[in-house]
Amino acid sequence: MAEGGSLRNRTRFGSRSNEAMNHVDYPDENFVEEIQLNSDTEVMEKPRPIQIVLAHEDDHNFELDETALESILMQDHIRDLNVVVLSVAGAFRKGKSFLLDFMLRFMYSQSSSWIGGNYEPLTGFTWRGGCERETTGIQIWSEVFVVEKPDGSKVAVILMDTQGAFDSQSTIKDCATVFALSTMTSSVQVYNLSQNIQEDDLQHLQLFTEYGRLAMEEIYKKPFQTLMFLIRDWSYPYEHSYGLEGGNKFLEKRLQVKQNQHEELQNVRKHIHSCFTNIGCFLLPHPGLKVATNPYFDGRLVEIDDEFKKELRELVPLLLAPENLVEKEISGSKVTCRDLLEYFKAYIKIYQGEELPHPKSMLQATAEANNMAAVAGAKDTYSRSMEQVCGGDKPYIAPSDLERKHLDLKETCIKQFRSVKKMGGEEFCRRYQEQLEAEIEETYANFLKHNDGKNIFYAARTPATLFAVMFAMYIISGLTGFIGMNSIATICNLIMGLTLLSFCTWAYVKYSGEFRELGTLIDQIAEIIWEQLLKPLSDNLMEDNIRQTVRNSIKAGLTDQVSGRLKTN
């Protein structure tokens, strides 16, 4: 590719009739589209991987580099083209970037020898040998390839590289977010696995795709498009041959739902089938010991086993040949580069917020379920025991006795919770014990209200309060009317009428069960009047009466003593 005012070559792949599903014929140079760029307005940079989703390790959050993404997707010649996004995801240090660089060779090539020369170093997405992660966040290649499909339509092809999952610095949420984002925005997701498809690989796929499906506002049939299982270092060609045919037979067995399978295993497989429109599998051999053990390996084909190169020549065209390209769709509609930019912005906001639940490790999820079950068991014990004390068919019990029973049962239930074997450790379990105590107190408050409702005096508080208000207003109205204070008498009559209307309404609500909110409001107003006015007044009157009674008793006692002494003298 030339820079500045030179011509940019973009590869066009023609299609001819092929005898096998994987066979691809390569075009001659007449199919290469040349795009003239104005050197005065655009300075071409060397194509390179561009970081579009940044990973912040300190707070385990992700940020979209909108400027970088916009500079790629909003170029004049591609922004209104339908987009094809091929993403490679999977565990870290399994060769995702290495594979993508061969895809770049295919996209830039103009001949059937796209795989390159034997002594040509592999360049493109950064990769290296070793055990430490290389890629973080999400990267895309800065060069968007415009390809003409067999039907004559042009599409924009984007290659995406993702942060490897399950490294020592990433949480389950980090892994789920990266995988979900790449799956939601890609039309083909290559799930890069090593040696085999393990059950935990399927479980992680279920978790990650469900995390992506939660973030999508509308689900149109199956939310995602094509999933390609790529099994690297396949060691059993005598059972299933390398390539697509052997891979699909192997995958069919792995994803088969059997009657004798455990329900959990069946659900995993059903979920995966429900998420993707197309699912395939490709078996790729090991690239050779020189690749695995040479610290200076730079991708030269001479050091790669011939069997690997043979299958690689089948795999890459299978994904990227013009007749095999899968255009990105969301909710049944084709997505352009311009649309993809907006979807990226919308999706990253969802994952930056707190609307979605946080994915958890298997240990944490199991520990939570274990502790929640212990909480539920202890709370059930408390509720059943309290039902025996003050349930619906039990008579009213004194509040002091009820509180004493509550405290005894609470202590018993906490002991029951502690006695259950739980995962997570003491600190983890303490949070659930505090949750249990709070829920028991909340349940006790409900039982207390239910018990108060059985108290005939408590049940009669509202009508008694309303009658007291009406009686008081009647007396005050009569007195103020008698002495000529007619305005006050009128106000008292108005209050008395409103109180009478409230009483009739309350009686209707209790009888019919309708307008319960209105009945509750009347009860609350009556309770306020009782607590703030009538109860303090009655307490004062009672205190005065008791004080006067005590005074009279003392006076009578003293009088009797004095009289007795006088008689004695």
From Swiss-Prot:
Keywords: Coiled coil, Endoplasmic reticulum, GTP-binding, Hydrolase, Magnesium, Membrane, Metal-binding, Nucleotide-binding, Transmembrane, Transmembrane helix. Residues 454-462 are annotated as: Linker. Residues 486-487 are lumenal. Residues 1-49 are annotated as: N-terminal hypervariable region (HVR). It catalyses: GTP + H2O = GDP + phosphate + H(+). Mg(2+) binds at S97. The chain crosses the membrane at residues 465-485, 488-508. It is a multi-pass membrane protein. Residues 362-453 are annotated as: 3HB (three-helix bundle) domain. Residues 244-272 form a coiled coil. Residues 535-569 are annotated as: Autoinhibitory domain. Its main location: endoplasmic reticulum. Residues 80-324 form the GB1/RHD3-type G domain. GO terms for molecular function: GTP binding; GTPase activity; GTPase-dependent fusogenic activity. InterPro entries: G_GB1_RHD3_dom, Guanylate-bd/ATL_C, Guanylate-bd_C_sf, Guanylate-bd_N, P-loop_NTPase. Residues 1-464, 509-569 are cytoplasmic. The GB1/RHD3-type G domain mediates GTP-binding and hydrolysis as well as homodimerization. The two three-helix bundle (3HB) regions in the homodimer are loosely associated initially, but they tighten upon GTP hydrolysis, facilitating the fusion of membranes. Monomeric and homodimeric. The homodimer, transiently formed by two molecules on opposing membranes, is the active form mediating ER membrane fusion. Belongs to the TRAFAC class dynamin-like GTPase superfamily. GB1/RHD3 GTPase family. GB1 subfamily. Atlastin-2 (ATL2) is a membrane-anchored GTPase that mediates the GTP-dependent fusion of endoplasmic reticulum (ER) membranes, maintaining the continuous ER network. It facilitates the formation of three-way junctions where ER tubules intersect. Two atlastin-2 on neighboring ER tubules bind GTP and form loose homodimers through the GB1/RHD3-type G domains and 3HB regions. Upon GTP hydrolysis, the 3HB regions tighten, pulling the membranes together to drive their fusion. After fusion, the homodimer disassembles upon release of inorganic phosphate (Pi). This is Atlastin-2. The lineage of its organism: Eukaryota, Metazoa, Chordata, Craniata, Vertebrata.
